[in-house]
Amino acid sequence: MVKGIFPALGLAIAVTLAGGPAFAGAGDPVKGEKVFKKCKACHSAKPGKHKVGPSLAGVFGRKAGTAEGYKKYRGLKGADYTWDEALLDEYLTNPKNFVKKRGAKGTSMGFRLKKDAQRADVIAYLKTLK
């Protein structure tokens, strides 16, 4: 029984130190800015300039559903989490499932980024927006 514990413990430590499976890793903000062009139909990178969706300036580290001046939140209104790499990665993978999993009403965002590298790059870019 003890022999089986050490490999499992080693695997758990390795996954933890590697950042876990939830986030693909460090992205390239320059590439992310290019991928973000797909997002610009609905989102702005300028503070306070909202479109169909909220401005994404300052989104990293901000409590979800709280972009100042944006009033159209559905699924993220009243959220109790703050955007970090893992949550942004999960959200961008499938926004509708993300909000449903958290018991929210839904989201009008149907766009998703299917490629891990693109999500990592966009997240790296979002981190540069203040």
What are these regions (language model features)?
Residues 43-49, 61-62:
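Detector for the c-type heme attachment site
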